[in-house]
Amino acid sequence: MKIHALLTSLAVAAVVSAATPVSAQETIRLRIASGHPPVNTYVNLMQNFFVPEVTKRVAERTKHKVEFVEGYGGAMVKVADTLEGVQSGIIDIGGYCFCFEPSNLPLHAFQVMLPFGTMSPVMSVKIAREVYDQVPYLSKVFEDKYRQKLIALIADNGYNLGTNFEWNKVSDLKGQKLAGAGLNLKWLEYAGATPVQSSLPEAYTAMQTGVYNGWIMFPSGWVNFKLYEVGKYYTEIGFGAITWHGLTINSARWAKLPKEVQDIILEVAKEYEAKTGTVNEENYPKQLEDLKAKGTVVRKLPDDVRADWAKSLADWPKQKAKELDAQGLPATQVLALTLAAAEKAGHKWPLRYQVK
């Protein structure tokens, strides 16, 4: 009797088990991180849009539950180590700037190779997405070489130049120590300045102690990292809004996720990508006003100064494209597509670069 009852209960349990996947009974934990802190717009959107939206939609539309373990501002990975953090599985999802991967992702700074592009982050991320969609290598390289999947592009706000000294023409910058990150250091080099590689978390102390006297930076960085305290001058030179950050997920972790959870992550990531454009664009004028209110001298230089700087860089895009082409990368194709996409969107270059 007891044996019969036991067999019956085991049979029922087996039926229930077969009907209910093990994964449906598990909580999915994902570690998400960035070396930058939440005062950065894209990290703020990771924390306050991507994470809660994925959590909510998975709970509402599936039998699963997602819990995120969050680590920003270098708590889990540093700014220059995030690609490797995702690659190794130390974290599952990472947001980072390709500027810190000049060897691993040299072509992904392609908008930087065409300075004085659109100052609209909305337009920038749309242009970048159009190019990524036409050149599969740009997305596939993450999976093929770095064991991660690119799920969103991230736009920055428009880059300008903040300094602790006043300047009015490009020649005023000659010999000045100015900071940047990755390939945008070339903008400084061609202008005659002394470029210094740096990152936002160290910017305040570096300017305070005279390591350098200015930064290629968008206004949110000048506001949120209080750089106005050590750099009184913020000059709108209009280098362009650059899309050269990304959000990636470890490939092995991705493969283990249920299909419906994958679909929701991609859905939210697409919205997140668009928001990096719209939120940055909405905040730009507010941040300039905030800087003025804090005593910063905010000026917009005449178009002829912008054109002079562009002329100093006239041959660089073609040179850089040839250099990367020689490494087997589709650089000339990517730069040509970017120029065309920007012009189709209505952008007028101060100098029309020739890359072929």
Regions found by a protein language model. Name each.
Residues 25-125, 140-356:
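N-terminal secretory/targeting leader peptides
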Residues 8-18:
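Bacterial N-terminal signal peptides
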Residues 125-139:
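Signature of the catalytic double-stranded beta-helix
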Residues 1-5:
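Positively charged n-region of N-terminal signal peptides that target proteins for export
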Residues 18-24:
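Sec/Tat signal peptide C-region and signal peptidase I cleavage site
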